[in-house]
């Protein structure tokens, strides 16, 4: 790892032009050297998550000389996903177990506390059930945390970060609540989701009793308290009347009046940028095409600093993962569609930025392909946002196209930034189409819920409409189109073919769901109340409808070459899903090409050699059917 000191005007070097170069597959998929940098409250230290195959370890560095001061490793399949500094010498680590590259954590994460030099390590009792609600700089031994009791309510407590002792502050009768607290940790509001997914907002009155002020069932609207204003009286809410993207408002509880602060007609906020003393809301971040900030307080000194830093990186998206508590040091992350990103530490007193780390220094932006935001109109008039990536140095006309739906599907979305799979496919000459179909997250509750019970119908039609757009625009050759996705994207890759049997020349399903009724019986989702409620909410009620939306029950409509990829250790989408589709295709006399790893891999492959083997075979498969190796269009 290298570091250097740079003045702001010299932060960016102009990239020279370059002809398309075939980049080795391993360069796209090998782990970054680091990710998830966090800054200590003094700005003296950083922590860095370091992926190492089937685990992610943590390292701490002293910023002045980038010397290692501590390292933490919790073993195989354990990943240190998040670090939260609780005072200037100590932080919490959230350690989860994951069984695949596309997996969310399995079970409740473990939480450990440690000093930055590795001393005074502690297993935080029940730590994975806690969410940190507030830090208390005036009381560095304690933080304010919340956790669901398991009895239908949520408890707010003070937690001693050195001995793990807990003292209850308040309890609210909401199953899974987030509290809004004052600077000294006193709860004022609570908002959460009940087991039936109803949203509830409550306010704490002067007599310490909680009063319900809003429920989503009664109003059909959303009314979510986010944080107290710096005056200690008014409250920042996000509100939506009919499921449209929520707008940020400042509410005065004394009068009930709300003042608009920020909104975007297309997307919801992704996070808030606050002052170093955490009192003032400075800006709201949106991911509308390319990520950006909307400053709500343009005159605050720290807002001026942030705006200047954004202007210093004109061709990159800029995020601010941390600021020292005295406001003097700002952690800056700058990245783009062709640049995996670098971290800098900006000193507000000197006006200079020190380069800290770049996670994938071997990636050359001038060899990558531009990802362009697009807007597509669906057949029912709904506006769909997405991205098209055109191979570098191509003329962008009549290209072989990969429709690449994202996983999830509810909550996640595709965004602008460096995507190894997309860049690999573009580097091999394929245009890549990503569309945020209805059901995707980030575009408001109404948009997300419009995909419920329509996994295999309207959501798929959105993808088809996006492909038709690419054909009309002259980007895609209509006789050279394949689909590829993972998890829900793997399901969609097959269901697009079921719904449009003659439109595609091949399809690839990676750890995909292919039998919706089986989701209610197998895998880790139906093992929890939340998971069972989720399945009932997003899938059709009748077995016949579920089967109609399942590729495994529509084998007769899948008449093109299929590749299936799965890991035998997958708990999110178990091998039974793969078996249902594979066996059906074999019985129909159309056996798929298959990659099944039986030993270590789960919901997405971790091992680099396994990934290289997978994408090598994928490249050959795509080339045979829509690439240079395709002798003629494949007839269904």
List each language-model region with its residue ranges.
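Bacterial N-terminal signal peptides
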Residues: 7-15
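Sec/Tat signal peptide C-region and signal peptidase I cleavage site
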Residues: 16-20
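Beta-strand-rich domains and repeat architectures in extracellular enzymes and scaffolds
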Residues: 26-56, 330
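Peripheral, non-catalytic segments that deliver or gate enzyme domains
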Residues: 32, 54, 97-98, 103-110, ...
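Beta-propeller domains
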Residues: 49-70
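Blade-loop segments of beta-propeller domains
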Residues: 67-100
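Cap/lid segment of the alpha/beta-hydrolase catalytic domain
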Residues: 363-479, 486-487, 521-529
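Active-site-proximal cap/loop segments of hydrolase catalytic domains
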Residues: 437-636
């Amino acid at each position: 790892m290298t570091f250097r000191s740079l003045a702001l005007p010299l932060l960016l070097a102009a990239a020279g032009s370059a002809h398309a170069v075939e980049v080795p597959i391993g360069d796209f998929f090998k782990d970054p050297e680091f990710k998830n940098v966090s800054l200590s409250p003094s700005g003296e230290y950083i922590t860095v998550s370091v992926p190492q195959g089937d685990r992610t370890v943590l390292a701490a560095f002293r910023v002045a000389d980038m010397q290692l001061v501590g390292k933490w490793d919790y073993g195989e399949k354990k990943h240190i996903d998040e670090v939260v500094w609780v005072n200037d010498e100590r932080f919490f680590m959230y350690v989860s177990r994951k069984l695949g590259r596309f997996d969310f954590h399995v079970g409740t994460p473990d939480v450990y506390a440690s000093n930055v030099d590795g001393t005074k390590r502690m297993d935080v009792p029940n730590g994975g059930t806690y969410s940190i609600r507030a830090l208390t700089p005036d009381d560095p031994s304690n933080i304010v945390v919340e956790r669901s009791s398991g009895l239908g309510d949520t408890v707010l407590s003070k937690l001693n970060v050195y001995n793990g002792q807990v003292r209850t502050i308040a309890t609210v009768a909401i199953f899974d609540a987030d509290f809004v607290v004052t600077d000294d940790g006193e709860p004022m509001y609570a908002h959460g989701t009940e087991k039936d997914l109803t949203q509830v907002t409550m306010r704490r009155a002067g007599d310490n009793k909680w009063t319900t002020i809003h429920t989503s069932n009664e109003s059909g609207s959303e009314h979510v308290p986010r944080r107290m204003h710096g005056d200690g009286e008014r409250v920042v809410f996000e509100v939506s009347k009919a499921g449209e993207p929520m707008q940020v408002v400042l509410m005065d509880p004394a009068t009930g009046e709300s003042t608009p602060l920020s909104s975007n007609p297309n997307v919801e906020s992704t996070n808030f940028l606050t002052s170093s003393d955490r009192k003032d809301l400075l800006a709201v971040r949106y991911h509308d095409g390319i990520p950006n900030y909307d400053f709500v307080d343009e005159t605050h000194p720290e807002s001026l600093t942030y705006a200047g830093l954004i202007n210093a990186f004109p061709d990159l998206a800029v995020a601010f993962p941390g600021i020292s508590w005295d406001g003097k040091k700002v952690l800056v992350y700058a990245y783009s569609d062709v640049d995996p990103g670098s971290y800098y530490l900006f000193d507000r007193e000197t006006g200079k930025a020190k380069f800290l780390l770049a996670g994938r220094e071997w990636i050359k932006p001038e060899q990558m392909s531009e990802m362009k935001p697009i807007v597509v109109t669906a057949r029912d008039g709904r506006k769909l946002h997405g991205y098209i990536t055109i191979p570098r140095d191509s003329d962008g006309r009549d290209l072989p196209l990969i429709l690449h739906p994202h996983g999830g599907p509810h909550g996640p979305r595709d965004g602008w930034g460096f995507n190894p799979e997309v860049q690999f496919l573009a580097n091999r000459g394929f245009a890549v189409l990503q569309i945020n179909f209805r059901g995707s997250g980030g575009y408001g509750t109404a948009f997300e819920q419009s995909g419920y019970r329509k996994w295999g119908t309207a959501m798929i039609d959105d993808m088809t409409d996006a492909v038709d757009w690419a054909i009309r625009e002259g980007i895609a050759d209509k006789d050279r189109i394949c689909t590829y996705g993972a998890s829900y994207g793997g399901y969609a890759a097959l269901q697009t073919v079921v719904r449009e049997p003659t439109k595609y020349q091949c399809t690839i399903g990676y750890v995909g769901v292919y039998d919706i009724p089986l989701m209610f019986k197998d895998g880790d989702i139906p093992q929890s109340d939340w998971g069972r409620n989720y399945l009932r909410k997003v899938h059709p009620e009748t077995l016949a409808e579920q089967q109609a939306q399942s590729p495994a029950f529509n084998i007769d409509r899948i008449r093109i070459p299929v590749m299936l990829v799965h890991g035998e250790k997958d708990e999110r989408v178990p091998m039974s899903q793969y078996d249902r589709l594979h066996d059906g295709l074999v019985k129909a006399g159309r056996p798929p090409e298959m990659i099944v790893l039986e030993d270590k891999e789960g919901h997405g492959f971790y091992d680099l050699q396994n990934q290289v083997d997978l994408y090598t075979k994928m490249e050959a498969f795509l080339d045979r059917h829509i690439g240079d190796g395709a002798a003629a269009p494949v007839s269904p």
